[in-house]
Amino acid sequence: MNGGSDLKHATGSGSDPKHAAEMDPDSDAGQVAVALAYQRFEPRAYLRNNYAPPRGDLSNPDGVGPWKLRCMAQVFATGEVSGRVLIDIGSGPTIYQLLSACAHFEDITMTDFLEVNRQELGLWLREEPGAFDWSVYSQHACLIEDKGESWQEKERQLRARVKRVLPIDVHKPQPLGTPSLVPLPADALVSAFCLEAVSPDLTSFQRALHHITTLLRPGGHLLLIGALEESWYLAGEARLSVVPVSEEEVREALVLGGYEVRELRTYIMPAHLCTGVDDVKGIFFAWAQKMEVQV
C-alpha cells in the first residue's frame, strides 16, 4: 500500500509459490504458509487499495505517496547513490519506487515472487492497453526533482533502463537462483514493502535481508521502504500476514546485516489514510550503505 501495505511483494523464486515451497526442503512451515497465502494475491485490488485515492492522492504534500517519492528523490539528489546496476527487490506490481533511481542506473532489474505481479509490470513496461496508469506518480516525481524533465521523458527512461523482470525468493541464500541472469554484484538495491510482508517472524526478516545483501557490492547502497507495526493487509480475496517491525528493529537488522545506516525516517499514517485495508501504523525509509569489510 502506499503505506504498510505496499506489501505487494511476495517471496519466492518461481512462478508457483506452492511448487516452490514443496521443492525446497529447507523452507520452514511459516515460509511455506506465506507462499501459499500469496497465491490469492490480486495485483489490481492491491493497486486500488494503495495507489488510487485516498492513498494515491498526491495533491496533499503531507500524504504518504509524496513522502515516499520525496525520500527517494532526496537521496538520489545527493549524487552518492549511482552506478551501473540496480536491482529492485520484490517490485510487486508497482514502479513508483524507481522513478528517481532510473536517471542514475543504466541496467535495472525488477523482481517478484509472483508471476501475476511480473505480468502486471510487463503490461506497463510494454505500454499495453489496460496497464496501470502511473502518470500521476511520474508527474509528481518530476515536480519534486525540478530538473525540467517531462513525465513522459521520465517514464520513457525508466522503461528503457529496466532490462529484465525476474522471479526472486528472498528466503533462499541465492535469491535470484543460479546462474544469475543479473550482472552481479549490484551497485544498489531498492526494496519497498517486501521483506516484512513475506517474513513470518523477525528472524526470517533478518535472514532475508542477509540474503539480498549478498547481491550488493561492498560500499553499495540499499534504499528500503517498509511498514511499521503492521500485522496484516488485504489484496482482494487475500488477507496477508506481515511481521510487525519497529524503527529500532529495522535499524538493528541493518546493522547486523553489515550496513552503516545513513538515514532512517518514519512517517506516521494519518487517520484519513487508515482505510481498513490493513492495520499499518507508519512507514519507514532507510538509506544504508554496505560496509566495505563485513564484520
From Swiss-Prot:
It catalyses: phenylethanolamine + S-adenosyl-L-methionine = N-methylphenylethanolamine + S-adenosyl-L-homocysteine + H(+); (R)-noradrenaline + S-adenosyl-L-methionine = (R)-adrenaline + S-adenosyl-L-homocysteine + H(+); (R)-normetanephrine + S-adenosyl-L-methionine = (R)-metanephrine + S-adenosyl-L-homocysteine + H(+); (R)-octopamine + S-adenosyl-L-methionine = (R)-synephrine + S-adenosyl-L-homocysteine + H(+). GO terms for molecular function: phenylethanolamine N-methyltransferase activity. Pathway: Catecholamine biosynthesis; (R)-adrenaline biosynthesis; (R)-adrenaline from (R)-noradrenaline: step 1/1. S-adenosyl-L-methionine binds at Y46, Y51, G90, S91, Y96, D112, N117, D169, V170, A192. Sequence repeats lie at residues 4-10, 14-20. It holds the Pfam family NNMT_PNMT_TEMT. Octopamine binds at E230, D278. Its EC number is 2.1.1.28. This is Phenylethanolamine N-methyltransferase. The gene is Pnmt.
